[in-house]
Structure formats: structure tokens, C-alpha cells
Amino acid sequence: MLVFAVIFFVFALPSLFGRDVEIYVEDRDLEIPLEGALIRSWDGTEYECDEDGKVFISVPDDRQVVVQGAYPGYENGRLAISLGRDHFTLALHLSGIMENRELVIEASRPGVSESRSGRSVAISGPELARTAEIGIIEDVMTSIKLLPGVGYSGMFNAMPSIRGGDPGDLEAVLDGFYLARPYHWGGGVSIFDPKMISSAQLSHGVFSTRYGHTISGLLEITSKKADPTEMELDVGLSTSAASINLSYPLFGKGGIMFMGKVTYWDLLVWTAQGISKAAPGNETLDLINAVSTAPYIRSAALSANYRFTTDLELTLNGFFGSDGVGASYNTSYDEDGLLGGEVAGDDGISGSVAMDFDYHNYQGFGIAGLTFNPMPTMALRATAGVGYTELIAEGLVNNDVIVSYNQKFLDIYDNPFVSIFNPLIPPVYAPILPPTGTYHAPDLNAGINSDNLVFNAQARFDMDWDLGKGFLVALGVQELYTNWKQYEDVGLFMESYMQPGFVNNKYDLLAIYGTPFLTAVIWPFHKIVDVNNHGLFSSAYTLMEYTTPNQFFGTEVGIRMDHLYFSGKGFSVPADPIWSPRANFDFNILKNKDLFGISNFLESFSFTAGTGLFSSMNENISFIEEGNDGLESLKLNRSWTTVIGTKLDFAGGFSFNIEGYYKQVFNRAHIMADITFDSADSVNVKWGFDGEGRIWGFDLQLQKLASRYIDGWISYTFTNAKYYEPSNSEFGFGGIGGGEEEDNDWYYPSFHRFHNFNLVLNIKPVKQFSIALRFGFASGQPTTKTTYGEVYPYPVQQADWDETLQKYVPRLDENGNQVIIQKFRRDAIGREETRGPWSLPLDLKFSFFIFDKKGKVQTEIYLGAENLLSLVYKPQETGTTFNEYTGKEDTGSNSASFDLPIPMVSFGFKWSY
């Protein structure tokens, strides 16, 4: 009720503190309206003029204020808003002199972000900053995750599901350049700092054939350009980050911008570690104590633009970033076998387990773009660039543990021994157990050293040609080369269950051991992965747009071709060309018309419908090795999407949009279940390219455009998504990494949520103070609740690989006896498919502003808090973890609601000039 009371109160604020005035912006000489002109209000808020050059803004009703107007190619203007009037005109004139040139009002160039029903939703300017700059991490993806059609993914997950698609299907593009893995912390946050971005557009419908390489969602990022006439400086410092942004003009024809930022979590980790020690028992917080290197991010970006003439512009963008984290964890068990507070001797374990892990990620890219207008009706753009990302991970787990055989195990392990796995095997004598009644557990000595490098080089050429009379044609070609390098040195112990008649002499334990009852064996596995694969994507597209003179009807139809040539060490796979036709149809039923006398209430009403095909490559395919089964049938992921929607624009800056969609996924790549081990260091992975998906749903958004006192939006998304892998049907489950299963092998994926709701508000009661609020709820993700039978021990024989015999042989102890360890198991007797708890994120930010008299310097002091409801909301437990070495359940819950059970608080200031 408190939230709704606040909403009601702030909606009443305009009537208490101000008034709305209309500003009309025109060309001084031609006296024509300037659509898209920006009005910067007295408090720094920006407003955009409509197609008639008009905009409504809120101003104080007790004094005169001054606003600024800006439009590309025109000199900035100032306008005094005096008392007693409600309508004002601001006339701007062209900057400089253009001889023998005609004035042309151009449409937005390709790549400019805009919200279009059935295609995309865009966020830019102040609303982007307000939603992305609330928490301890300022990230554009924080804003994207609040848009309709986006599934909740948690506080530290920048890879959401877009309209039921796999999170990995989302493709990011910066100024036309495809980015490989634009994330820090393994996908926890993105590299897109709001200070370097002017707008972000999420295309989750039937978007233009200009772009491909995705079957679910395209994120188009437009970089920020430096002001060509004024220097700008922004400095920020908070409890978790320090940043600087400098923009410098270049002779009035462009500018250069630098951004540097360091994110440090030392204070946050130190605080969490203190809380965990003061309130022990929370397993999630206890893990914080293992952090040896606090999570960090270091990034720098450089952008420049220069307009040589009115028809020729050069843009440059560069980025470099690094991030990492380190952990060191040590668990000790006392001589009595104390483990996690159990009764002394209950587990019979003494010793220690140590774990060390270090993760570092590096990435960078450089992009150059040239835009040329050879004639007023044609725009040409060439883009080229290179990029790379490298992930280095090192981990090691060691243990020095002595375990006592418990009595239940000794009762089972008796001579003569009858196999509990196969009663038909005659009784035999088992290997002798040590007289001490204990054994030295095998040192896991599990380690991984990984170096994963992705390099890409790409170029594209695009042309837009306005043919007149509402017709526009566009075409383009693109080349994208990618080199995937992966080196991994993995060592660990694996357990196998072998039965008589197992057809692989390397694992024929009956022949090796002569003890047929020992059907379980733990053996060392060592694997070196050395992959060097190449992929060349060649693409071409063409499209045509048409709009009737009265803008009642518009359409965009096009077709795209993508071809992949994939090769690696000893193999090459030329895939067939993929054709992707797409079409959109728009009907502006009410625009600039008085239909049924309601134009004063409903300003526009439009309807849209679209359908099209899309394709992408599963990233996991990039690390396929020679000999992997299924490689010869490599296919690209495909989807067919159909969208219908309607949008209504109301008086007062309100808009409502609702869209429904159906998406059919096919040729989806997946790893099949029959993974086999050919030798001690050889793994054969079988791939399938027959995965399917059926996704349908709808989303809606009610938005209040930027205004003086309150703005924001409410969005709701419903998604029903099921997947199916026919190749895995014979194994009796939906697929590896799947979620909630269905009887017919169609299953809900692990990332699926039926319901997602977001409320975003920006409240500005006075010029010097604002409140930013983000609240949402999301239904739970699929999970399985399993009922188990009795826990019982079983013997496991430890094995080593014999290089001479090329077989696994028994490991012997110091007395020459075969090493036998005890493990525990429990059989599932029932399964219930259910859902995890609902997520209820609530974030708040309080900002205080200080302005100088000239309005050029602004200081912001803010206090932000994320995950506030974690103080009062306790998610239900959804399961425990069974310890195979102790036979007990480790307590704890699997929460899908919060990343940490405490609010994340940040405090800082920002200074801008």
C-alpha cells in the first residue's frame, strides 16, 4: 500500500508546484517545424519535439525560467519562459553558411534507436541514465532487463531470456559492429557503461534484415558523441567505483570523448565478511569469506567523430576492459570427525580440503565508420573493426582426508561377498580392508587451467536510397571472421558404474580386477583440449520500405542471406546458405486526425503485424573438435517469429503498447546424452541439430514520457516456452541442461518464467531532489523436487591408468592391497516438477543536486540501495544437497530470488561540467 500511496501522491504534484507550457521550435528562415529538436529545461531535463515541432514541458508557476533548444546543424537557442503565457516559439537558424546546397530534412539513419511496435523498444537519454545508474554497478543492461519481453535474470546476470529464448541467443551490436561476449564477470554485468552510450534498442520482434546472427533478440547500442562546441567533464566517486569522462570539441565539426572507470568491491566484500562472522550460519554469506581477490572491473573507452563536410563524417570507437575475482577456500575436519556441527565421530572424517580459484577476463575492440551522402536522398555507410576477448581461469582442489569405515558398510562388505548390483554373479571374496578400519581418501587433485580466446574481424557496407513518393530501398553486405582458440588442461576423478559385458576393454573391469562385484570404480581423468577453429560468416541483405503520403499505411519487406564456412584442425564444414525473409506492416489508424471527436484524448492509434525467419550459431559449436559425432550435419539455429501489436498515444505524454507473439525454434544445436570416454584423455561428444522450441506470449507497457515531476513505466510479460530434443528422447529426458520435464519430452527450460512485472518511477518533487524506484516480481523457475529412498553405502574401487597396458588397473596401498573406499547412494522413488520461489526485487536511489547560477556545473550526491525486500522476504527452501561421502544432506536452500540475502547499498557523488 505504501508504494501505491507514493504513486498517488506524486501524480498530484504538478497541480501543486507548476504548470505546463507549449514550446514550438521552427527554422528561423523557412518557418518550418523542426521535428526532433531537443529542449533542455531549467532543471536539466530534456524533451523532444514531435513531428509538428511542439513539446509540452512543466515549469514553476511562481517565477521566470530559461530553457535551451538544440537541433543538429543549427545554433543553440535560449528562450525565457515568462509568467502569464502558455505558448512560446523558439526560432533556430543554421550554423555557418552552406553555399549552393539545398536544405534537406533527413530521416533517421540506419542504427538510430527508436521504439517501433512489433519490432523494438528503445531507451535513451535521461531515462537510460536514471534506470542504469541506481546500484553499485552502473550498467545499461540493468535498464534493458526492465523492458517488456525480458525475463528476470537476477541482480548479477546480464544475460536475460528474451521472449522465451535461450539467454545465449541475445546478440549485441555497437554502431553496427557485432560484439563477442560483451560481459564482465562471466556474464554478470555488461561492458556498456551508460556514460559511453547515447541510446540502447532491444529488438525482440521482427526486426530489419540489416541484422542477423540471432534468433531471439538483438541489442543495438549507439555510442555517445562528443559535443562539437563545448567541453564536458564528468567525475564520479562511490563506495564501489570511480570514473571520469572527458569530452573535447574539434573545431566545431566533431569531438573526442574519453571514459575511464574502475569498479572495486573491496569495501563490499569486507562488510559482507564482517556480517557473516557476526551472524554465522548463513551458507551464502559464509562463502564470502573465501574471496581472496575482491571482484574488480577496469575499463577505458575512446570515441571520436569528425564531420569533414555536411555529407561526410568519420567515427572511431575503441574499448579495453578487464575483470576478475579470486577465491581461496579451506575446510578442516577435526580428529573426531566433526563436520558441519555433526556429533563427534558421526562422520568419521579428519583432515582438510583446500580450493583455490582465479579468474581473469580481458577484452577490447576498435571500430571505424564512414558515413557519406553522395546525394540528398542517399546515405552510404562503411564500417570495419577488430575485437578480441580472452578468459583465463585457474583452479585447484586438494584434499588430505582420512575416513573411517562405518559399521553399516562393514556389515555389507563381508566375505564371501554377494554383489548388491547383480545378484546373479556367484559369491566371491572381496579385497582385504586395512586393519585400521580407515582409508586415505583419494586426493581429488582436481585442477583446471583454461585459456579461452576469441578474435574477430568484420566489415560491412550499407546503403539507404530514398526513391521518393514514400519508397526507400536498402542493401548491404557483411563479412564476419572469427577465430576461436581454447586450451584447457583438466584433471579430476570420475566414477563409473560397470556391468558384466561392458563392451570396451579399457573399462572391462571384470577382466582387469577379477572381482565382478565391484561394479563401481573411481578413476583419474586427464584431458587436454587444444582447439583452434575458424568461422567465416558472409551475409547480404536487401529491403524496401514504403509509406503512403498520409502515413496511414507503411511496410518493410526484405530478405537476408547468411552463409557459414566452419573449419578446424583436420576438418572443415561448409554449411548451406540460410535465407531469412521478413516483412512488417504498419497501420496508423489515427494520427493527426480527429476520429470520433477524441483527438484531444487519443493522439494516435497504430496497429502492426510482422513475420520472419532468423538464424544464429550456437556459441558452444565453436569449440567442436575433429571426431565429434554429428559434426557432418552441422546446422545453424533457426526460428520463425510472428508478432502482432498495437500502440496508443494519449494526451499528456502517456502511451500504451501491447504485443503478442509466437516463435517456432528448429535446428537448435544441443549436446546429446551419449557422451563416451574413449581413453584416459579422450572424450567423444555427440552433437544433435534437431532441437525444437515452441514459444508464445504477450507483453504490455504503459509509459509516461519525460515530464517535470514524474515519469516512468509499468510493464508485464507473459511467456510460455517449451523445448524438445528428439535425439535425446531415447534417453528418457528432455535434454542436458534442461529444466522442468514433461511426459512427452517437451520441457520448460531452466531459465523460463511465466510472469514478469516491472514498475519504474522517477519522482522529482523539487529541482534539487529526485527519487528513482525500481520494483518487480517474477514467477519462479522450473525445479525438481525428488523423493528418495533409504541411504546405503557401497564399495568403490580406486583405479589408475597404466600407460604400458593401456588399461585401468587397481590402485594398491602401502601393504599391496587394493584400495577400497566407501560411498553412499540413495535411489529416487518419486519426482515432482515444481517451481522455485517468486523474486521480488526492489531498488531505490535518492539523489540531491547542486547547481551553479550559470547552470554549467552540476553536483549530484546520491544514496542507493538494491534488493531491499531481502530484509523482510524469506524465500522457501527448495532442496538440499546429498553428500556422497558422508551419506548425509548438507543443509541450505536453492533460492531463485536474490543473489545475496542482504541489501546492496551504495553512496557517492558525481560532478559534471
What are these regions (language model features)?
Residues 44-55:
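Short, acidic Ser/Thr/Gly-rich low-complexity loop/linker segments typical of extracellular
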Residues 75, 82, 87-88, 104-111, ...:
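Periplasmic N-terminal accessory/gating domains of Gram-negative outer-membrane beta-barrel systems
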Residues 768, 776-805, 809-820, 841, ...:
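C-terminal beta-signal and adjacent terminal beta-strands/loops
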Residues 587-642, 662-686, 774-788, 873-876:
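Surface-exposed extracellular loop regions of Gram-negative outer-membrane beta-barrel proteins
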Residues 42, 64, 68-80, 110:
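A short, solvent-exposed loop/turn motif at the edges and junctions
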Residues 240-264, 277-330, 358-382, 386, ...:
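Transmembrane beta-barrel wall of Gram-negative outer-membrane proteins
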Residues 307-322, 357-570, 657, 709, ...:
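Face-selective signature of the C-terminal outer-membrane beta-barrel domain
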